[in-house]
Amino acid sequence: MNTEEKKQSRLTKKQKRNIIIVIIVLAVMVLADFVWSNTYIEVKKLSAHFDNLPEGFEGCKIVQISDFHNEWGKGYIDRLTEKVKDCEPDYIFVTGDSVDQIFPDVDRSLEFMKKLPDICPVYLVMGNHEYNLSQEEREQFVAGCESYGVNVLYNEHTTLTRNGDTISLLGFDNMENDSEAFSQVTEDFVILLNHYPEDCNYFSKTAVQYGTHIDLSLIHISEP
């Protein structure tokens, strides 16, 4: 191999090395962006005003958590818990898909659920991912939640009392067996928890049939 051929060979090797490094750097940059976007916790604060909200609930703070999907480790769970604490909520509402159906890790979800009742009362409805778990996994999740003090609502009605005033809370995981829950509503202000946005119209119409209405629907959101 003459001098020129050796020079071209060295150049080719150098070019290949540079290309590989660029690909690795780009891959790392893409991975870093993916990890950041999937572990960064953004708190979105909304204020809602209602003419019929009882005076005792004036200034009430609610934290809604949805689609946790047991995807994150202890560090993320700790940070998320601190974010929730910082909001100083009166109630925490968990609206489904706390466990992932494809890669289920019930213990990890329960690790998070265990921390929430230490902050304030917690109410939970299940989503499609919980219902697509095995029966054993689903029962493990529900039993764990209830043992930690999380109130799991199955198509049922309960009440929340604050400063002497009471409002209704409805929690649904499907559109079946809803008549008993709606028939129990006697309060003027009603909150609905449900995972499925497409069901909201149905529940609104059903509420009217039972002589009541829904003031606030909290449903599936795309990120916890």
Map each language-model feature to its residues.
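Membrane-embedded segments
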Residues: 60-143, 148-151
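N-terminal membrane-anchoring alpha-helices
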Residues: 1-52, 56
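Mobile, glycine- and charge-enriched loop segments
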Residues: 41-74, 184-188
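Structural motif
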Residues: 62-64, 93-95, 123, 169-171, ...
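Short, well-ordered secondary-structure micro-motifs
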Residues: 4-8, 15-16, 75, 104-105, ...
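Conserved catalytic scaffold of divalent metal-dependent phosphoesterases
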Residues: 52-53, 70, 130-216
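Alpha-helical scaffolding within the catalytic cores
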Residues: 43-50, 79, 108-111, 152-156, ...
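Residue-level detector of conserved catalytic or cofactor/ligand-binding positions
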Residues: 217-224
